[in-house]
Amino acid sequence: MSEDNLGFVAINYISCTPEYQGRFEELFKSRAGAIDTLPGFRHMHVLKPQVPGEENLVISYWDTEEDFKAWTKSEAFIKGHKRGFEDVKKAKDAGQEPPMTSSFKTYEIITN
């Protein structure tokens, strides 16, 4: 990795209903781990807000943006998100609001 490319970070901002927060935490604590062996993956942190109702953060570190994008199109991505996607689908099929919503932003690391 060159000095010009210190890495890439994706931050997923996940809002959960109060009733779903515990389930969200359990999903990550018992995650499949499929991401751990993918090319370019460095590590991940899952952060719980100190203020109830604020967003959880899932911060993943990658060698390159291309590595991150390859993961989002992989079987490992589908496997790693299957249980959460099923929870959202179940709520929508029942005419309910989803128990969690998410959005993400990406960043280039400029200094260590």
Language model segments and positions:
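Short amphipathic alpha-helical segments
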Residues: 18-43, 76, 84
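An N-terminal domain-start capping segment
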Residues: 2-20
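Glycine-rich beta-strand-turn "strand-cap" elements at beta-sheet edges
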Residues: 1-6, 45-52, 82-112
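Non-catalytic surface loops within mature trypsin-like serine protease
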Residues: 16-18, 64, 108-111
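A generic structural signal for ordered secondary structure
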Residues: 7, 35-38, 55
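Short, well-ordered beta-strand segments in beta-rich or mixed alpha/beta enzyme
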Residues: 9-14, 45-76, 80
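Mobile, glycine- and charge-enriched loop segments
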Residues: 3-6, 25, 73-74
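An amphipathic, aromatic/His-enriched active-site/gating alpha helix that lines ligand/cofactor pockets
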Residues: 37-41, 63-102
